[in-house]
Amino acid sequence: MAEFNAMDTAAFKGVWVFCEQREGEIQSISYQLLSEGRKLANDLGVELCGVVMGSELNEDYVKALGGYGADRVYNIDSPLLKDYTTDGYAKALCDLIMDKKPEIMLIGATNLGRDLGPRCAARLHTGLTADCTHLDVDVEKYKNFLRTTSNIDVDNTKFEENTNLKMTRPAFGGHLMATIICPRFRPQMSTVRPGVMQMQAFDQAGADKVVIENVAPALTADDIHVQVLDIKKSAEKLVDLIGADVVVAVGRGISADPDKGIKLAEELAEALGGVVGASRAVTDEGWLSADHQVGQTGKTVHPRIYVALGISGAIQHVAGMQDSENIIAINKNENAPIFDVATYGIVGDLYKVVPELIKEIKAAKA
């Protein structure tokens, strides 16, 4: 077990990203976090390192992490890390952290990351902020963020000048946003949901020059108390909102006839080659499962086209889709806040408008 007090924090330098892989393939959340980590590392003037774990991973996959911003990649390789176990991964990662002492550690808020992050934070006796939607180390950039996302009188508020990681996340069911710091302990740890951070374009020059350090962990079978016997993929296919080019989302406006509203959304999504999303109101009612939810407490998406059907535009929902390239809003309330972020707006009854849209799209394709 390790414990670092305030006197030790100056010894910690660098931004690290845990790069998750499944069956040898690097997950997109890793590239998103490296892109965000690159910004933080630039602001701090430090190195950005990726950490990947597994057994005999493809060297090209490891080098590709440099193409998304990593200066250095620690490749922790062991047959005992072939399959994820909390004990094995936590020990290997914590041992490396205690040796190299990074000041920031970013982990994806995936099922794996939500298990690994808290275990590592507990071992290291440091803090972890979960499900972050915004990260800053530069005070001026943080002030600009507050100016655009809050009603705080930034210019008349005193801010402490430091480079602590300012970790912003939804609180109280998404009704508030809280910024959390960890000033006395290191590393400062944060988990970030997939789709929240923008992934930069791949840079081959970065991949060519990245430094790869192969690490043989001090790990034995006795360190791992759970044995993975078999891995079975879920029979249920979850909707891929984050990777979708088109999202057709439904809100409380379908309450008059939820089944019909969802059916129309599915037909429109099929016509456009997209998938169906939902506001929290829809998933709370059980009309669609939680994997369809878009927003602060759901998924953050950046599709080419986002169609909002009967969605009023609560700030919690808008936070999860406002960076879509084109937003088409259909709502019978002309004062609905969703029109403030919409590229195109249609004031009308979705049950009348959507069938006409579907008909026109199909005719155009014929």
Regions from the PLM with identified roles:
Residues 1-366:
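N-terminal glycine-rich FAD/FM-binding segment characteristic of electron-transfer flavoproteins
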